[in-house]
């Protein structure tokens, strides 16, 4: 099974956001074990680096990003995907639309997110971490 993991799931882990962190950690562990193939969208990486700046030093953030790249595959972003996302006016959030473009590219079975309503028009099935963990 292949999934694209939304940025908020990774933030749940690194910021230990209760009660979401445990389900997020379970998903990450399944990716580490190779039970599922996990992807992050390319733009998730700089977003994480920026958002985590208040909680982690630059050195720590670099190590976290390096470790993420060992666990997850990274879906590329190119001009074609960006233009496709820009033209989808039915997606209110441009960043979510980019995530969906990346999920389509990698043939993901699911986009795992805590914000499923943001993906109502997604071509890929969307699932919450809790519901995804129940599938495992």
Q: What spans do the regions from the language model cover?
A:
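Short, well-structured N-terminal submotif of metal-dependent ribonuclease cores
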Residues: 1-39, 53-60, 121, 135-136
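Acidic, PIN/NYN-like endoribonuclease modules and their adjacent C-terminal/linker elements
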Residues: 2, 104-136
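Short, flexible helix/strand-to-coil boundary loops that buttress conserved ligand/catalytic motifs
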Residues: 14, 86-89, 123
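Active-site-proximal, substrate-binding regions of enzyme catalytic domains
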Residues: 25, 45-47, 52-73, 80
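Active-site neighborhoods of divalent-metal-dependent phosphate/nucleic-acid chemistry enzymes
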Residues: 73-116
